[in-house]
């Protein structure tokens, strides 16, 4: 596993990159060692949530400039792994939303580090319930898309009985699929979210490709800075340099 020291204007953060996400690991190593991030800002900071950086357009950006859309001319294939989750200190890849990015491909350069909150078990159970409902809905919509032509033919022929039967069939299929592989939190996730904290609602949505091993106090300091509209810090928080360590 590679380690990278992120030297910022508020202190140093060391992250370890996971070997389980080789596409993101190799890309981050390439950009960091090539000086790509030097001089960029943590342009989006939300207290009790996360700090985001990696936009090359943030280098020397004047106050008030809207940031967050810059990056290289490529995206990265998602490497979303169930055992890599959004605990406090997780290093993750930013991306565009599902409506324009259904495959959840990552930004070529933008990343965020999780701060989040500590949850109690009842909060996680409620969240888990919502996750299961969402899982059924997403699976049902996927099945509808798969049977789109058949459904369109029924609509053209005004076959209401057939449409009703198809809906019931696909809903049952979706429920059966989800029962076989239910959404929820592992013991490791529950332990992390009820002790150190994090952002559990992002699990399964974004690629987590590393974690902070030193300098979590610096992350805390950055996530607590005052911000302007658009979540940009009032006073720039700059990445001075990134150094690849053994």
Language-model features: locations:
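Cyclophilin-like peptidyl-prolyl cis-trans isomerases
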Residues: 1-246
């Amino acid at each position: 596993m590679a380690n990278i020291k992120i030297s910022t204007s508020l202190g140093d953060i060391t992250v370890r990159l996971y070997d389980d996400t080789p596409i993101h690991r190799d890309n981050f190593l390439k950009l960091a060692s090539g000086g790509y991030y030097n001089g960029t800002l943590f342009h989006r900071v939300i207290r009790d949530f996360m700090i985001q950086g990696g936009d090359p357009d943030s280098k020397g950006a004047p106050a008030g400039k809207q940031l967050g859309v810059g990056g290289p001319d490529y995206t990265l294939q998602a490497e979303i792994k169930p055992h890599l989750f959004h605990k406090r200190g997780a290093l993750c890849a930013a991306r565009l939303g599902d409506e324009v990015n259904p495959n959840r491909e990552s930004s070529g350069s933008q990343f965020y580090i999780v701060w989040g909150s500590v949850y109690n078990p009842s909060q996680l159970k409620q969240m888990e319930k919502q996750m299961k409902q969402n899982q059924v809905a997403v699976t049902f919509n996927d099945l509808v898309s798969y049977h789109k032509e058949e459904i369109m033919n029924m609509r053209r022929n005004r076959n209401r009985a057939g449409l009703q039967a198809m809906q019931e069939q696909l809903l049952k299929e979706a429920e059966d699929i989800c029962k076989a592989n239910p959404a929820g939190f592992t013991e490791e996730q529950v332990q992390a979210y009820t002790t150190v904290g994090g952002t559990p609602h992002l699990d399964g949505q974004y690629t987590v490709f590393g974690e902070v091993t030193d300098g979590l106090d610096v992350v805390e300091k950055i996530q607590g800075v005052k911000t302007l509209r658009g979540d940009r810090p009032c006073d720039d928080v700059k990445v001075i340099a990134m150094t690849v360590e053994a």
